[in-house]
Amino acid sequence: MTNIRKTHPLMKIINHSLIDLPTPSNISAWWNFGSLLGLCLGIQIITGLFLAMHYTSDTLTAFSSVTHICRDVNYGWIIRYMHANGASMFFICLFLHVGRGIYYGSYTYSETWNIGILLLFAVMATAFMGYVLPWGQMSFWGATVITNLLSAIPYIGTDLVQWIWGGFSVDKATLTRFFAFHFILPFIIAALVMVHLLFLHETGSNNPTGIISDADKIPFHPYYTIKDTLGFLLLISLLLALVLFSPDLLGDPDNYTPANPLNTPPHIKPEWYFLFAYAILRSIPNKLGGVLALVLSIAILAAMPLLHTSKQRSMMFRPISQTLFWILVADLLTLTWIGGQPVEHPFIIIGQLASFLYFFLILVLMPISSLIENKLLKW
């Protein structure tokens, strides 16, 4: 009798994705972040669902409903802080996952890579709208500043902003629609994840060497199920440590002040995971130019398969490209730091130089270094 997991229509899909999936035998811990992102998405959907049961999306009661969750709901405080810090974990895993894709040349699977970029945009949109919901000072002013950027679009900009606001300023209509979108987007993300995996399983996983590994594959279960479980335990431990010991470490104290349209906070800044993009936005004096640079800071990832000039896929054996990759990482950390600083000397010039270097590295230096490495290897 054939095993049910190989014959049943539904079990067969699960079996081919998680059990009998042929997997390269040498993939390292950097390949753990895909499953960790799945775990983060699951945590966010479950905690978010319970928060939505108690939250009210009205400007008069939103702030107090979040306070009510923390004070009066059974274990509401842990649900709220797991959701808030879960977002930070989500982005840590996202950045590491994308970084791994760049380092090991996984972007050559262009369909998987492009769906991944769509996912990144969707998660960023979800996180932005989620940050508006507690209706604190930074929620309100963050929403005002970021939605206002759309007014830079020629001709339709102003109408577009008012259409998104549902009025002449960020108000009740804006909060209600942001809550609706924040609720639905994670499910759209989950569907996109399925498409992401569908395309990945068409080709199979890449591996650290970047060489086709068809000759040396092992089943996903038990080898990588065990490995992923270890990753889950480490991620949950880190998340719980953050939630239980320092839940407000990554938040902004201004968000504990209810939203007040008449009082602007001294420094409007987004959550830490958007600071690099915010620094790029601020480094260009022109409004439309800044908005374009902001979008391109993520969209530039789509150009990676086109800019790949090396004869090797992975950076594992390419020291010049490795050096440039780590300079890019340092540059992104610099941008993250600059995004949290006030707009004054010397931060302005540092931000402009770091923004220029970010695009210059990806568009010019990395493709040239690959060509040099080809020459050195007489290819």
From Swiss-Prot:
Cysteines joined through disulfide linkages: none
Positions of heme b b566 binding: H97, H196
Gene3D superfamilies, alphabetized: Cytochrome Bc1 Complex, Chain C
Membrane-spanning segments: 33-53, 77-98, 113-133, 178-198, 226-246, 288-308, 320-340, 347-367
UniProtKB keywords: Electron transport, Heme, Iron, Membrane, Metal-binding, Mitochondrion, Mitochondrion inner membrane, Respiratory chain, Transmembrane, Transmembrane helix, Transport, Ubiquinone
Cofactor note: Binds 2 heme b groups non-covalently.
Topology with respect to the bilayer: Multi-pass membrane protein
Major location category of this protein: mitochondrion
GO molecular-function term, one example from the UniProt record: ubiquinol-cytochrome-c reductase activity
Residues the record lists as binding a ubiquinone: H201
SUPFAM superfamilies: a domain/subunit of cytochrome bc1 complex (Ubiquinol-cytochrome c reductase) (SSF81648), Transmembrane di-heme cytochromes (SSF81342)
The family this protein is said to belong to: Belongs to the cytochrome b family.
Protein name per its UniProtKB record: Cytochrome b
